[in-house]
Swiss-Prot record:
Residues that hold Zn(2+) 1 according to the record: C1628, C1631, C1655, C1658
Keywords: Glycosyltransferase, Lipid biosynthesis, Lipid metabolism, Metal-binding, Repeat, Steroid biosynthesis, Steroid metabolism, Sterol biosynthesis, Sterol metabolism, Transferase, Zinc, Zinc-finger
Full protein name: UDP-sugar-dependent glycosyltransferase 52
Residue segments, region Disordered: 20-40, 142-166, 573-645, 707-756, 1011-1047, 1062-1085, 1110-1130, 1466-1488
Pfam families: EryCIII-like_C, FYVE, Glyco_transf_28, GRAM, PH
Designated gene of the protein: ugt52
EC annotation from Swiss-Prot or TrEMBL: 2.4.1.173
Amino acid sequence: MDEFTSDSLTTSRLLRQISHSDSLSSVGSSSNRSNSNYENKINNGIINDFDSTNANDGISNNSNNSNNNNNSSSILKIHQSPQSILSTEQQHQIQQYQQYHQQQIYESGYVPPHVYIFDPDYKSNNDEEDKEKRSLIELNKSTDLSNIKTTTTTTTTTTPPPLMIPENEEENKQLRQEILNELSKSESFTKIKEPGEIYGFCECSLLYNHLTCANLVITSNYLIFLPQQQVDSDYVLENYLYKKGDFFWKKYWFVLTPDSISWYKSSILKETHYPNGTILLSKIVTVDKLDPEETGKPFCLQIMTNTSIHLIQLDTEPQLEHWYHEINRMQKNLNVTIPIGDIVSITMESNAALFFDSLCLTLKKGENCLVTPSSSSNEVYSLLIKLWNRNRGVTVVEPEKQQRLLEFQKTFKLSQGVNLLIETPCVFYQDEEFSYEGVLYATTEGTLYFSSLDSVLIIPESDIYAITIDRKSDNRDALKVYTTDYDVLFFDSIDDIETFFNVISTSLARSNPKIFFSTVGQIPPIDEPKHDEKEHKSTYQTISSGIRSWKIPIPSLPNFSIPIPKSIPIPLFRSKSSSHLDPQNSQQQQQQQQQSSSLQLDDNNNNIVIPHTSNPTTIIPSTSSSSAIPPPPSSTSSTSSTTHEKTIIIQKNSSINSTFHDIFPLLPLDETVIMFQNCSLYYYSYDSNVEGIVYITKSYIAFNPSPLDKQQQQQQQQQQQQPNSSSITSTTYDRDLDTDSDTDSESDFDYPKQSQHDNSVVMVNNNQYKVKEVLMKKALIPIEDIVSVTKERFLLFFNQCVKIITLDHKWIFGSLNNINSFYNLILETWKQIPKTLLDSSSSSSSSSSSSLLSSSPNNNNSDLNINGNSEGSIFTPLESIKIKNKLGLPADEVLITWFNCTNFKGAQLKYGFLYISNNNICFRSKFGFQKRTIVIPLSQVIEIKKYSAFIPNGIKITTASHHEFQFASFIHRNRVYQILYETWLKANNKKSNSSNSLSSSPTITSPLAISPSIASPSITPPSSTPPSSTTPSSTTPTITSPTIHSTLPSTVVYNDIQEIIDGENNSNNNNNNNNTNNTNKSNSFIGNVEEDVDKIKRSIKSLPILKIHSAQQQQQQQPKTTTTTTSTTTTNLISPRLLTPLTITQSPGFSSLVNSPILPVKPLRITILTIGSRGDIQPFIALSLGLKEYGHNVTLATHELYRDLISKEFGLNYQPLGGDPRELMDLCVRNGIFTPKFIKEALSRFRSFIDDLLLTCWKAVQNSNTQVLIATPGCFAGPHIGEVLQIPFFNAFTMPFTRTRTYPNPFAPFASHQMGGVFNLATHVMMEKVLWQPISGQINQWRTETLKIPPWNSSVSINETYRMPYLYCFSKYLVPKPPDWSGEIAITGYWTLKNQANSDSPPDDLIQFLNEESSTENDDIPIYIGFGSIVIDNPTALSLLLIEAIKLSGKRAIISQGWGGLSIDEHNNNNNNNNNNNNGENSDSNKSSLQSNRIYLLKKPVDHSWLFEKVSLVISHGGAGTVAASLLAAKPTIVVPFFGDQFFWGERIKQTGIGTSIPFDILTAKSLSSHIISILNEPSVRAKVNKMSHLLKREDGVKTAIDFIHRYLPFSFIPPREIPFSSAPNSCMGCKQPFTLLHVMKARVHCHCCGKIFCESCTSHKCPIKKYRINTPVRVCDKCFNDLQSNPSSNSFILND
């Protein structure tokens, strides 16, 4: 008996704890334990002593069993002790007992989760097993332990059984309905089409590519794995990162979603909706952080998938850690669906070291996954076997019979099970030269199978001509089987030949009455063959006669207990489009055959071409049962896919075919080798070539790499012959000649191969060998997947090579001895593919994603093609793939047609092609350096109409977000219009039908496969109709909710929107208002735009986005949401934690901060320095409150004007700063910021202000005993204080203030003008000098006298020099992140207050004014006009202008008095005020504002978030806070900028199409009134501002900022300024050795950590300094080196440090 050691127990227990780390709330709950009616009485002596034996392993005992620990004796000890002897039978029974209770003895206090089984026949099937368990328990009780000195005290405990089986049918229905109700609230489950009836539910761990914990839902059609560890489905991590391409690194905008990693060219998605590339998280095998020495670059992530390797470089170490952990975290939230029909085998893996009691599932694609149930593995295994057999149409009751059938299936390599009719031992022979003893089987399908130790014989029913009993045999009667080609097979030594003959004759007579039967040995009648058959027979008569000449070997079969074939341990690399071995594809292939055979081969020949001939009497046709070509849509036959057409005899362990099938055990037996050669295969995906042998069969091209040591020897010999070329390895790629100049290289990561030093060459070569050892895979290329075959020269091989392009990969075979034969054979085999199969495969590619995942491959959506032609007849397969890759379309998209046209955007015309597919309208420009790519989902289109403007024959397409796309110059505009219109209607009808049927028959979505770029020209296909894209009918495993393009924009407001598309038609919004309104009424398909949006809302089904929330989040949101309906069943079943009900209605606002969260860092003393107006201060109040809620001690230092607001109203610590914001505001408004007049007056008036500000900042930080400092650039003192105190420092600002080419500096005089990247960058450099030069003397004097540090003499700021972390409190949707901003810069979103102060409650007369309605209009919502803290030079003139504009617009208005002192002229409003004076509602003494029917003057500050919700339009000065409040309230904005950043915000409002900007210098009443009317009457503006508001409310800027601060705390220190040599002492500051004339040769060296000067001996150490973001080793002094080694992370405030 195998002993269960403590090591294996520890490993198993750890795996179980991993699997149960996130268990369901219903599992092991108190209600289930209290209501359990089951009792499991066991002998606790075994368990307790076993626990005490492994006490060192951390296994705790239950309190109920604590009294038995000292007195009990373990049976395991008895067995292991040499003095204790048990009988063999007792040892075997105890071993069975231990295996059965393995799940319950890890921890005595552990209760396994329940496994729900709803099979009504399950209990009866397990009665015998229950009896066996009870007998084992009784055996344990009666075991004689007299040899043990200590007595055993046996106690019983009552534990809830892990298996939950309903008592009756009613309870069965109730439990099933309860779980179904929970599952129906999960989008991952509802998207599955026809999931079937639920039979089981349990927790498990799934090992597929990576290990995850999941909940397994077992239905009659699927195995559905839902995640246990939930993450926020709306959470998106995005930033600019570098990705390794073919040769260079390129920066992309990376977006991490809950199911994929996608990258785009830029963060502004106004050119395309689809990414440049995508990595499915489900396909990721490993994510590793690479050492800089391996890649030559720091902060690199290596992401390895099934087929490729991607290398990504990040900017900082915190960013690297953040992405690394987020990718691993989101992998735990994936959903995997496995159709039961795709399972090839299910076995129980009980001997594995880590995964005992696991279920090994082998899938059709050759993939394997391990499922480890939390408990009751045997019961789950039995249930899966039953459902699997039922799905295959096989009825198996006895386990022995089931195992025998599985062994039979594996023996004959059948992909589907069969029903055995009878079997008998016999001797098979055809002549005296060979005979085999074995077993003859007959199945209900009529096929005869014979198996022996040396051979396998398969005689299909279609090849049987006659069966007789030979009475003339010498020994006993023999059974003679005649084939249709008149070969005779003898089966002798059958025990009861009469019975066997009667059974098979009865069965065959029913299926094929033409078969001749005789019991007396009568010779069957022979029909004269037809003329063509005679010629065919005579052609091969000299080659083969009889079965002897076509003996085909098969490999030795693996043991039954291990389902994975034991072949050479090299992974298999398949073409992902149709590399699976689909058994349901033989019907169509049997129509047209490729006849092939193989003669006896010489294993020693390196270049063997087997004649492409066959004997039709003996060779199975080319259309094997395992071929991957799908049947045509009309094929509905349910015949077993494992049937053969001709008789096959296969000898084991002989010739090359035996070796071939040993290497590729999953291939069917009839795949014989036609040719094999030694060659080199260049793996294009990995940029590596591998030596090996290529095999060609009738259906596949297979490659097996040679061992790595042989390749190394060959390469070393080549390097010795060519010593000069050893240092440089060729990295030449075969580029696509048709590739555009802007086409990004999507090739996967290749390690660096060039070096200048010999040592680095050795390291690089070693890395290459290591990579090849990891990536060396067998290749299996289905011939039907081939798109093109070319013979050309490739620089890597120097000679000619054969390039094969499939649907998803590129294969290059070189170093071929007989390249012409290899090329011709592949070309000839490719030509033999039946044309009907190609047509069916091309038509099947047009099927929808839901049909791809259905079990039936017969669905076809060819009606999507308007022209009635399939995609293959318009576009060749290679053209189709190239077009989809350039447009970023998914692989299953069906291209319908294309047209030449021009696209009009702004003032630019682009000529190109308009592509129409079944789901999108696409445009791709042809000329120009920068290509224009536009992808418009048909689901977003609300209007298609003809128009003629600047360019003739135009068509305008309008989306739901009111973006207009104009295409013109169509030669046949009517035809284009008709196709677009019909395709649009069909797409919307399909979406509507699928949406309406979602509740009854939910659909499943397939993963969106983004094929890699195929960069190679192809030759003309060899046949008239080339092979087109084949759609795999197998879909295992499938991610049920892959949102690869989760950033795809959908209908405004109604769906989740990830990005806003700006810049499409913003310049023409105002010019085309009247034209748009008129055409909407006359020429549009749907008259009213609002009705269009409503209809699209009802009909559109957007891309699926996961929305499963955690239980904690649901509990927090529950008071704000509608109550979910509870089940009416009486069963006390608690909902599983991960299947929590989804909220139907949620608050549109952002989620609030978590109360009392677990602090990631220690509580810190944080000081925030800021100055400015109320709008500048308020965001930092929100940040301070958030930090305080996290447990930090926050001090906010600002002007004395805001003391009461900060300390009294919000309860924050306050420190005063110098200066009056009113004086600064008045100076800026009167003179303009940073003008010569402004600088002249500022130097005279504000020199004392700067000195006072610097001193008060220093005092505020000292008084607060600051540990972390956050400051705005306007305080000037922030980075200098952070440098002297050596504390973490963060910049924070409300506008972009970092150098970039995307935006100009907001304070620049021309900030509102976009003049290119060089100009924008120059404005930042100019403003840095303008800000620094006037005050540099004061700051340096303050540094030297007060801070005691050297002066800062550089004109480049400290922030730019050291790349300090920067927090920007605005939205990425309004100001997208520029590509040249690194990871230290975070755009967090707006910092808004959760609750405003009570003192800002609105006055009663304002509420009354808002509630009044105009007598002329029913909906006369007022507009808001206010300029906040702007000090206006002439407030009376501005007030009159505003009143006049309000009168012209005919709107009601609220005017805020603000700091500018706006007022209303009483004379202009006498008529409107008479009614109010007569009513006497307001007295003259207490009147705080003037109220009229049209205008209200607001004198008291009111909360903008409350007020803006009540108005229709906001007119403001463009301050950052006011703009944020208006956007959050979803109100259009008119910005009247006065100075500074207000011009920048006005320009951003105008560019995004949510308002406009009118500079104050050119403001007139007429222009203002016209803009008010146009904006309020423009539907597109309302739609865009609603979208923007929805996006902003989803952001949580405060939480994002706090997370960023915590993440960058260890890396936000400012290095101390190096002491100048001129002012340094004349001696080393370490050893004190003088630098005098006697030591003039002694070098002086700066320490990069402390900045002091030392000699070389005192700075001999080098190391990176992470807290200063210095990642390369630099010189440091001995003291600093010791400090860095003792605390390498410099993160003393981290809790877990």
